[in-house]
């Protein structure tokens, strides 16, 4: 009987040694050391490992608590952070920082926004109304589906110095709040998710709508009669392929080069210039006077990331100069 009691006591002591109980400790988090109180699972060295709760203060002195999964003293896995102010964030943590959910992970944000309450999300959109500036920041409305001009989202940015205008493209990371409910201009009821931003930036068209997936520096140049054409680089995106071209006229007359006369062939198929009316890409000048150069972007449909040929037709205003098509074999 005594042996059994001793065994139970030893097991209890071991269990207590592997669990913190309101113990003060310093965690070496990825953004700096934090000293606070920890309760929960620990390893044999007393380091938080498993499920636990850590309470500390930020640099501004505000108290906050993380409760969830720990790995080797770091927030790693599902967790929840609550600030004294009442702010809450829930989600998956990696290296002590919450990981925003985005893309297909938030496709139901606009049908059931209440399911994302306190979740950290990342959205990219276009501002579609005049921003409303207040004492402590700015409120903007964005369409997170830029292509279809849908997915109305209301964003609160607590930074009065942040400059943003109607029709700007923005990237937002923040915490989802209570859905906004109101009426549209026709009296119909609308519901829109709200986000309090922790990260925010103005983007250009390319980064917002067709971000580069892979970029290749090419820098191939061909010259005829002093008229040079250079394929500078290629950018592959999900929605399009961008070819950066430079033309330089050191010839005897005007050099005429039109982007619609630049064609790509790949795997037995021919691709022509694709309209990009909303893009702010630089355009090639058509009729280039002697001694001048021009640079621009020609947009094509989505191509495979495989070798292709681009043929650029051009001519000079000196009809005695017979200029053949500039043909570039692009390999990666």
Model-predicted segments: where are they?
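Short, solvent-exposed, Trp/other aromatic-anchored flexible loops in extracytoplasmic proteins
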Residues: 158-183, 270-322
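Low-complexity, acidic Ser/Thr/Pro/Gly-rich terminal tails and inter-domain linkers that flank the onset
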Residues: 101-105, 209-236
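Short, acidic/polar linear motifs in exposed loop/turn regions
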Residues: 131, 249-253, 304
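Sec-dependent N-terminal signal peptides of Gram-positive bacterial secreted proteins and lipoproteins
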Residues: 2-22
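Surface-exposed edge beta-strand/loop patches
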Residues: 185-224, 258-265, 288-332
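Conserved anchor residues at repeat-unit boundaries in beta-strand-based tandem repeats, strongest
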Residues: 37-48, 64-77, 88-98
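OB-fold single-stranded nucleic acid-binding module
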Residues: 101-106, 110-122, 127-209
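Short, well-ordered beta-strand segments enriched in hydrophobic/aromatic residues
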Residues: 241-249
């Amino acid at each position: 009987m005594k042996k059994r009691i001793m065994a139970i006591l030893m097991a209890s002591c071991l269990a207590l040694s592997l669990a913190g109980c309101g113990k003060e400790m310093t965690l070496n988090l990825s953004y700096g050391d934090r000293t606070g109180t920890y309760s929960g699972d620990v390893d044999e060295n007393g380091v938080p490992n498993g499920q636990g709760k850590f309470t500390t203060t930020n640099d501004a002195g505000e108290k906050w608590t993380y409760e969830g999964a720990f790995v080797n003293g770091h927030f790693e896995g599902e967790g929840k952070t609550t600030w004294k102010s009442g702010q809450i964030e829930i989600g998956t943590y990696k290296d002590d920082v919450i990981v925003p959910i985005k893309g297909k992970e938030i496709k139901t944000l606009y049908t059931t926004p209440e399911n994302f309450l306190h979740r950290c999300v990342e959205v990219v959109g276009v501002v579609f109304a005049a921003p409303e500036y207040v004492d402590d920041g700015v409120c903007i409305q964005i369409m997170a589906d830029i292509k279809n001009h849908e997915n109305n989202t209301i964003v609160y940015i607590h930074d009065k110095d942040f400059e943003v205008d109607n029709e700007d493209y923005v990237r937002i990371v923040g915490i989802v709040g209570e859905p906004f409910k109101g009426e549209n201009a026709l009296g119909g009821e609308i519901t829109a998710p709200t986000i309090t931003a922790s990260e925010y930036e103005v983007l250009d068209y390319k980064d917002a709508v067709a971000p580069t997936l892979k970029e290749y520096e090419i820098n191939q140049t061909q010259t005829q009669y002093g008229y040079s054409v250079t394929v500078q680089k290629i950018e592959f995106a999900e929605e399009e392929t961008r070819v950066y071209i430079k033309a330089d006229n050191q010839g005897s007359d005007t050099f005429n080069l039109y982007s619609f006369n630049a064609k790509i062939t790949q795997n037995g198929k021919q691709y022509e210039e694709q309209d990009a009316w909303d893009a702010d890409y630089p355009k090639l000048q058509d009729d280039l006077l002697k001694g001048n150069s021009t640079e621009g972007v020609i947009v094509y449909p989505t191509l495979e990331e495989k070798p292709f040929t681009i043929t650029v037709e051009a001519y000079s205003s000196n009809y005695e100069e017979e200029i053949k098509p500039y043909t570039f074999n692009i390999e990666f």
